[in-house]
Amino acid sequence: MGKVEILIIESVTPCEQCRKAEAIANELAKKYEGVTVRVINVLDPEADKFGVVMTPTVVVNGVIISVRRAPDPERLERLIKNRLGGV
């Protein structure tokens, strides 16, 4: 079984979309074993690797999947299932 890391890069003061992205990711992490969620601030040096200029930015296994809004829950779930090996 694969592993999935969801990285949410939030604004200094998390906005509504940041909080929504975090809630969606955490809900899916509870549903699927092997999924982890990390949340960092846009000022974190790690955010520089992705060239983040707008938040939230949602990254799955190193690939940006959503910018400036929470990801679509169904799309994120399909991506997770695919990365986990078709759970």
Task: Describe the function of each predicted region.
Residues 1-6, 49-61:
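Conserved N-terminal glycine/acidic-rich loop preference
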Residues 21-23, 52-55, 73-74:
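Short, glycine/charged-enriched secondary-structure capping and boundary segments
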Residues 1-27:
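Local sequence-structure signature of Cys/Sec-based thiol-disulfide redox active-site neighborhoods
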Residues 22-40:
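Conserved helix-turn-beta segment immediately C-terminal to the redox Cys motif
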Residues 13-16, 47, 65:
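Glycine-/small-residue-rich active-site loops that bind phosphorylated ligands and cofactors
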Residues 61-87:
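Non-catalytic, surface beta->alpha helical segment in thiol-disulfide oxidoreductase systems
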Residues 36-54:
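Thioredoxin-like thiol-disulfide oxidoreductase module
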